[in-house]
Amino acid sequence: MLKNSHVCIIIWLFGFISGFNIMITGNTLNYWFAKKDIALQTIGILSFITLPYSINFLLAPVFDTVQIKCLNKILGHRLSWICLTSTTLISLTSILSFLDPGTDLVLLSFIAFIISFFSATQDTILSALRTEIVPKELLGFTSGIYIFGYRVGMLLASSGAIYLSIYLTFNKIYQIFACVIFVYLILLILVSRYTNSVDVIEENTSYFYVARCYTMEEMHLKNEFFIKHYFNFFKNCISAYLLKIFSGSHVYRNDISLAYFIVLILIFLVLYRLPDNLINVMINPFLLHLGYNAFEIASVCKFCGVIGAIIGGLIGGIIMKYKNMLYSILLFGIIHALSHILFILLEVNGKNSLILFITIGIESITGGMTMTAYIAFISSLCQGKFRATQYSLLSSMMGISRSIFPIISGYMVVNFGWQNFFLFTTIITIPSLLILLKIQTKL
């Protein structure tokens, strides 16, 4: 059995690398593009690079069943997959470090997309391994450890990288990224001797038994299995998922149809986070446009932004203890939408460190509050023993909002200007709140 201290170290490492990897192809790459004066329209379109994070749940059955025989005997089922994905990430990040967005944009974007795919893949595997090695009584505590590691990883790969760009080129920084992933892999292998994760997933925790449609023998078929059964599995799995979410609820028995209700929920999940996701893609070009340097962006926008989000999460959690969830979602959504008006004030006044600090502080705190309510809402929709699958599918809507719709953000800025862009991010919150009022009586 794992000792509690070993569990904490391993879970912290899991969180660290997840947060670190998402920044490699996320905000840090976005900042590099902006510094290279890549067109705003192009920067917006390249938000699709993070799309694999939206659909990583589709690959979960593969990593539950397929074994890497050459590594499985040495490291075990999960760790062998982690070793493979980490090695691939090291190689791809090293290749990316020799490219230049100014001259190799297409190739660099393609490699970044593949990096994002393997990062999302690793997240899925780490999540599965985390559920296997953490005792039930430590789930709450280790979740905090995981989030702490995640935030540290994000800070180092975003704020830390932008600060380093004062002294180093981004090519050198991405070489450092590859070295960090290598060190992480070595550390994880060293502590892996403490793990006791199983090689074959038990029936009651297997992804495939969510839909109850295949036997263990069928699950271990190789190429023939994936060709014949992969999509059938997901059809059955999603059907079981939808039935389980709403079985026994007011929704399932009321005049509003199940399909219509589900569509409304999915639209809400996309629209509620859309303003933040539009801004996140354009925030680096906006700050550079105003004349802020790398140090100011790293310290105020990135570092203080993360701290503000943490504080906002705590405030949101406290408020939700005394107010019901739907009231909190509505209240936080309105407050956060109004905070976007501060970006217009910043654009009107030009470079002003005090206004920047106030804007980022308020936007981050209210953003942390909305995120807390958002996650709580998703969790409330998940019922029964299929919660993991339900949560993965619902949370993928957040990823779609982050990866697909922000494609238009660059075009909006170029054609309508920064002030109208931020005004739009304020107004676009209204449809999501109207949908919330529509569905609240059915929840």
Curated annotation (Swiss-Prot):
Membrane topology: Multi-pass membrane protein
Cellular component terms per the entry's GO annotation: plasma membrane
Keyword Transport: yes
One Gene Ontology MF term: transmembrane transporter activity
Highest taxon in the source lineage: Bacteria
Similarity field: Belongs to the major facilitator superfamily.
Transmembrane segments annotated in the record for this chain: 6-26, 43-63, 74-96, 106-128, 144-164, 172-192, 255-275, 300-320, 326-346, 355-375, 394-414, 416-436
Cellular compartments annotated: Cell inner membrane
Main localization category: membrane
InterPro entries noted in UniProt: AmpG_permease/AT-1, MFS, MFS_dom, MFS_trans_sf
Keyword vocabulary terms for this entry: Cell inner membrane, Cell membrane, Membrane, Transmembrane, Transmembrane helix, Transport
Protein name: Putative transporter AmpG 1
